[in-house]
């Protein structure tokens, strides 16, 4: 039996911070101990946490690892490597790959592939289309994290835009629907208008006017209406506007069937950043005004935003060249998501307890993940140790994503991920990832 004692830690868990230690026995947390308490049995390995923060591993509910079919820019192994280095111990991957994850065959192939490649734990969304709503009730609810619904066209073009199909998806899903909400008719009209005025590829600064706040608010409002009509479980992804916040309830997660995610990119950048970062920060929905960013940040200290995700979506830098219509949408983010939000903690925008709630606890609760997301005896030992006082600057040579770049390059951070544990194994330490480790399928109790 393998027993590891992580001692002298500041444990952040379930709304509290306390000095203590944790005993890992094989894959699971065996004991959570107060400051001076020693383990009930001897431990073969002892790790001194040096007073650093010890928290549950981050669960990222929103990634695009580009595997299969788009592996020139990312794959499950490289991106799970970046995840481990960033303190992310579990991910849920989107269906807009090649082939798209819109059949049971494609879904099962993804799971089989991840079992041989992924360093951290994983699950996959099943993609809704205009033709597969009848398949949704047959999905294995204990294995599939959710149904992804594109109510706006984005990378991979999986748009579901027929009202009768949308109603059927909301009626048939039987599990969480994760929705990308942008009204395509508004985007199309804006695209036509801007092309007429500025040519075939308007400047990147017009991206938030083409994929506008109006498009987001309209689509999110429609999704919420359909969810209420069908008593469906709806999770709206990457909220990007101040107006959308008015659509959600400031209630505890346990009392809601309609929830919201904000992504690091929309919490960190705003439209002025297009001047320097240009297409590097182009994403869908677009990064909008400072007023939108500030409203999203303010909402982090409330229950309006339930989850912080990344929408990690790598592309090669050459694919990010061009203007608002030519540059592709998406950016790598998973390796720096935790330290980025720790900067917001440092600025007083949210507390570290709220960070852990929105990046660790809430994804586990919202998706009904079995035995993860909390530091509790009997739970899987997915943990991250964070140095709260280590200043460093992001450089290109530290990027582990296959695409080889990050919009965070040059950013100064004041905290650092020191160690990451996945299922009791130390997979990241001293700037090195254990490439031989393999994560597990997430399981869902529904």
Model-derived regions: residue spans:
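Short, acidic/polar
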Residues: 73-80, 130-139, 222
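Histidine-rich, glycine-flanked metal-binding segment
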Residues: 1-5, 10-56
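Histidine/acidic residue-rich metal-binding segments in metalloenzymes
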Residues: 134-308
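His/Asp/Glu-enriched, well-ordered alpha-helical/loop segment
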Residues: 201-222, 226-231, 301-308, 313-389
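Metal-associated gating/positioning segment near the N- to mid-region
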Residues: 50-117
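Divalent metal-coordination and catalytic microenvironments
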Residues: 9, 22, 27, 51, ...
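A glycine-rich helix N-cap at a beta->alpha junction
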Residues: 112-128
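C-terminal cap of metal-dependent C-N hydrolases
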Residues: 9, 323, 377-443
